[in-house]
Amino acid sequence: MKKTMSAITAAAAVTSCFTGFGAASFSAPAKAAAQTNTLSENTNQSAAELVKNLYNTAYKGEMPQQAQGLTINKSTKGDVHAAFGEPERPVGGDNRFDLYHWNMGQPGYGFSYHKDMTISEIRYFGTGVERQLNLGGVTPEVLQKQLGPVNRVLTVPFTDEIDYVYDTGRYELHFVIGTDQTADHVNLKAK
């Protein structure tokens, strides 16, 4: 009787593995695929929203989020320091930007200045945490879908990066795309 019950139990276990009924099931790959699709949809939606936000604020000569209100050719280095504090890496040597690194889910920024200390260029680095939901989700395809045809495409000297330039009124918005075909950073400057 014991051998019969063991054989029945073993047969049931093997059958359940192949049919999907019982303790063992092959639903894990399906669940992983569904999660991947959801992540991809969230990435595309987040990237699309970021692109639109960057584009819309660029018409005012500004970048979004913490940098909003700091305007190209108007706001000063003092205004930047009042808003962000002292830069983690100040202008100097080969570095022409006051750099503020990303942290705690907040994006990083860089600010370059004219001789009169007004902002000449703002650089947006995005976030380091969940980057695929920020600049890591911005691709040439996302730019085309959200903003339409690019005004100019430039090659960044000494790198393999491509610069997709969109005119935004009196300003230019530069999406610098790396070799992985995602945005490395975004620059805003006056024409």
From Swiss-Prot:
Keyword set, alphabetical order: Signal
The cross-references to InterPro entries, in alphabetical order and at most eight, read: DUF4309
Asked if the Swiss-Prot or TrEMBL record annotates the protein with the keyword Metal-binding, the reply is: no
Q: Name one Pfam family in it.
A: DUF4309
UniProt keyword Signal present: yes
Where does the signal peptide begin and end? 1-23
Q: What is this protein called?
A: Uncharacterized protein YjgB
The organism is: Bacillus subtilis (strain 168)
